[in-house]
Amino acid sequence: MVSSNHCATLTRCAAAVAAALLSLQASAQAPSPTTTAPEAGLSAITVTGNWLDNPTEEKVLDHAGARTIVERARIEETGSSSLRDVLRLVPGVQVQDSNGTGGSDVSLNIGVRGLTARLSPRSYVLMDGVPVSYAPYGQPQLSLAPVSLGNLESVDVIRGAGSVRYGPQNVGGIINFVTRAIPKTFAAEASVGTEIYSHGGNAKTTPSLFVGGTNESGLGLALLYSGTHGDGWRAGNDKTDIDDILVKGAYRISAQDDIAVSLHHFEGSGRMPGGLTAAQYAADPFQSTRSYDSFDGRRTDASFKYNHKDGRNNFEVLGYYVDSFRGSYIEQDNANQRRLTAAPRSYHYFGIEPRYSRLFETGSVVQEVSVGYRYLKESSSEVALRTAYYNPATMANAMALPITPYQTSQGGTTAHAFYIDDRIDIGNWTITPGVRYERINSFNNVSNLGADGSTVTSQLFPKADAREFLPTLSVLYRMNAQWSLFANAGKSFGPQQYAQLAQTERGLHPESAKTYEVGTHYNSPALNAELTLFNIDFDKELLLTRVGVDGIWTDLGATRHRGIESSLRYDLGQWNAALKGLTAGVSYTYTEAVSRAGDFAGRDLPLYSRHTGQLWARYALGQWTLNADLAAQSKQRSPGSGTQYVTQEDAAGQLGDIPGFATVGLRAGYDFGKSLSNLRVAVGVKNLFERRYYTRSTDNNGGKYVGMPRTLYVQGTLPF
């Protein structure tokens, strides 16, 4: 939980940074360009270097794989209040509502192309290029997702052709949350949003603050704050409190060299209302029968980045240190009794990533060769505790019961990654071969304790070493300045996690997959479109299943994920002047993710939809902006892990098919302009027609989880 000392520290830091920012206002001016003109022999061609920097639609057009950028304006106009809302806008990405042990706004459950969504383990998730998971190798789950929406400028989702530069756990692509940049002149903005739910009588507020600027000497500073506070739509035990503060600094050393630093602190706590049995859901889908389930976590990280770019050469060094903690309380059910479990865990890691890129010319052929390295060292300390069993009907306060540790573990990983790729431009063609080499050494020392919580009864000392070459080849052809075609093939890899190392008797292996894409990008002032065919062949895939109250990792074996992703946005005013201000868009994704081994061979994997789609329209008239959105998904499966593929709902509400659904949202916004200090306000509604939908979970607090009911929201933004 957030302590008073932490709050006092954050307050003092915020006050100091705000004072420094105000001192910049008087002298702030637009800085001079940070790169020189290209060398004469290169004409307009300049080195790209890190293609995660400054994501734009032009970069998407030049990327030889599926890539989607969701910008801040689109985030605001969809009424998004969480990372989940934004990622639902991306073709191929499916988002599970909060459920199970990922059952609060502090966590993030996303699955790409039919991959498991529970705690987002198979996408490499970054914020400004820095990993956001507890431990990128040993604990990649996002039960704590330390990113708050109000601090973001855009969300960059790279689903293909990224595994050479970024990893591990990249079979589900790379997701980079891009925070707001330090402005060239002094700027500040405060905003707040509030959601009011039609059930539970609850409301949730999302305040944010941004202030920053750059002075004439090239020194820039920015303070960003974003939070979430309030209760959700369940009748009890679903309060959320999130505070996310980021301080960014930058200094332009010369026209070719600059440095950037950041200091980030995130604290979040979320109550988890838990799942319902089939009978409980039928009686009241919004009730909660769990009073103690909760999750809290915090993360502090710092990063430093040096960048040199002269048109032909680009050298970059990124270093970061991350310290995080997470704790949870969850009740376990057994024969009409319960016991309270706790799982405090601490992690920290240090990483350094140098990279060098250089342009070469050979006649009409231009090459950009990039070489990079990453050293990452991480450690973990985990404790598992539990009370004795009790009768929940008569227990007044389970938190007052003695709670005893029964297992401890100390883990760590030392990893070296090397990569090289060569972007070869020949006329309209770009061919990029590359390879990444991962060398990983991991261990997890596990001690099982007796009933007294101190006597060691048994120990395990598993280790794992991995040496993996991950080649990729991508090809892009430019039909013209607005249209490109692409294809790529590569190999992705996921090392064993700490919890998997401890299960030595189950014969678990690192995950590996081969990925293939063919597609196209189109970008013009009137039309923006993308179309991608994809195929993922998993040689090995691990799955977390439940045996009684315990979570067990099993080797699911071979799986195949294939399908088509598409999206289109059209400015109808470019077609007919009478439709000026009207823009419409549509997206559709078909995914087939099936097991190719075991009892469920040929059957759908759990908790993904074969069909997902969106239809939206935007109309701007004067100072008004009107938005309408429709989102739909087909049914999902929750078949269990036994020998029978379950399709009918069980009494616990954990297994059985999940019906598809569609929801409609409307929004109206007004910009007062200079008449009222550029104030922007909006009002909207989500799930307009009160469509009742749900998901399932097989966790200890699993069952049926009702989705968002009709929700009214208001937004206000004031620049100053």
Regions found by a protein language model. Give the residues of each.
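N-terminal periplasmic accessory domains that precede
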Residues: L83-V86, L108-G114, S123-D128, L142-S148, ...
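Extracytoplasmic beta-strand/coil segments of soluble accessory domains associated
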Residues: K59, R84, R88-P131
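Transmembrane beta-barrel wall of Gram-negative outer-membrane proteins
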Residues: G200-P273, S294-K305, H416
